[in-house]
Amino acid sequence: MAATLTPEQITEYKGIFEMFDEEGNGLVKTDDLESLMSLIGINPTKRDLANMAKDVDKDKKGTFNCDGFLVLMGIYHEKSKNQDEELRAAFKVFDKEHKGYIEWDTLKYVLMNAGEPLNEHEAELMMKEADKDGDGTIDYEEFVAMMTGESFKLTQ
């Protein structure tokens, strides 16, 4: 799975891994996984972090090696890519005219009528929170942040 990483990513992740390999034995404590991920700019939920720790620490010794970490990062990037594709497809549903943004009225209608519907006040609060640049529309980056609860950069 590490094959899904670019050579640059592999080099970067190996370097960061080595920073946490305090004893120089090729192992990092699973307790350090959150700090390691945070340094990369990934902030998983506690549940995701527990699952990741379980994935990299198969022998339950409380440590993981660089290969396991690279496999984990490959899986993470693959999931991120899949999520991005799903979000792009959803965004296109709302951006029917391919303007690159979603009108407030369109989004408000969807938020109030689809899935677990929000009331008008909740929908407006969510949209105001999502509209980071205050232009009255939701662009793709704002849409992703709203849907995932995370900030998103197109450079990822």
From Swiss-Prot:
It comes from the Eukaryota. One of its GO terms (cellular component) is cytoplasm. Keywords: Calcium, Cytoplasm, Metal-binding, Repeat. Pfam families: EF-hand_7, EF-hand_8. InterPro entries: CALM/Myosin/TropC-like, EF-hand-dom_pair, EF_Hand_1_Ca_BS, EF_hand_dom. This is Calglandulin. It comes from Pseudonaja textilis. GO terms for molecular function: calcium ion binding.
